[in-house]
Amino acid sequence: LPTSDSNISLGLSYGATLISTSAIIGFGGLAGWIGFSIPLTMIIPFVGLIYIATVYIGPKVWKANKKIKAKTYIEMIGKHYNTPMISKLLALITVGLIPFYCVAVLIGVGKFITTFTGIEFVHAVIGFSLLVFGTIVYGGMSSVLKNDMIQGIIVILGSLIVLSITVFVHMQVPGFWDNLVGAWAAVPEGDGLYKLGFTGFDTWPEFWSRGWLMITTLLVFTIPVGLITLPQLQTRWMMAKDDKSFKTIASWGVIIPGLAIVTFMLAAISAN
């Protein structure tokens, strides 16, 4: 693996891999339905846990790989546990499942290109595939790192623009926050949200209710633990320059998830 000389670029690429468009749309829509309990709950696990994991777990992964000198994450796992069978199993799983993921991504990108350019779907998919292939062959993980860094910059700029416009527009409406709270209060008592334990636009669900359990188990435990165990994140930890780089990497890496949470707040505001 190449070593990244820029902690900022590594942090931006790290953060960019944590957030996807589908996650923003999905959780944004959910926030528009049930209110601020979604983004407020996500602040602690997404920002706090990811930062702590990067600062405290990242250096250990880096030091372990410095001794092993593995070229891939799969190789590092096998050498660390001194079990080649693990590497073979992980490689088999990767080779078997990655094509399904690639097909889904290529279909989405192909339809996007077709919609905005008018190019035939087949030509769009072939052209994009050749572009990705050339990038990987030419630069390897360095190309992936730079691509993710650019994606992270775009996400930051786009989020700040959307944030500024949305806040400016809604601030023009007198008492817009009271209107949001009032709209939630107008929901009939027998509505499904009340049955699940939700109590208001800017309040938490009742403790141990179905709504509280849904938010806690999904957003506090399941997703953050899954995020910090993603192989592509471990791979970026392996690419750090030294074990002192991780505070900078973590600081820049949590910016993008933080902005995503702001996006969920904006979704809750604009949807209501």
Locations of the language-model features?
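Residue-level recognition of pore/gate-forming positions within transmembrane alpha-helices
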Residues: 17-18, 46-50, 94-95, 129-133, ...
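Residues that define the loop-to-transmembrane-helix transition and helix capping
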Residues: 7, 84, 122-123, 141-142, ...
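Membrane-water interface regions at transmembrane-helix termini and the short interhelical loops
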Residues: 30-36, 57-63, 108-116, 130-152, ...
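Helix-loop-helix module between adjacent transmembrane segments
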Residues: 41-136, 218-226
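Loop-to-helix junctions at membrane interfaces in multi-pass transport proteins
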Residues: 2-5, 26-33, 37-43, 78, ...
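Membrane-interface "cap" regions at the ends of multi-pass membrane proteins
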Residues: 1-25, 136-139
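Hydrophobic core positions of alpha-helical segments in small-molecule transporters
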Residues: 89, 127, 147-150, 249-252
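Structural signature of transmembrane alpha-helix termini at the membrane-water interface
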Residues: 51-59, 103-110, 134-141, 160-171, ...
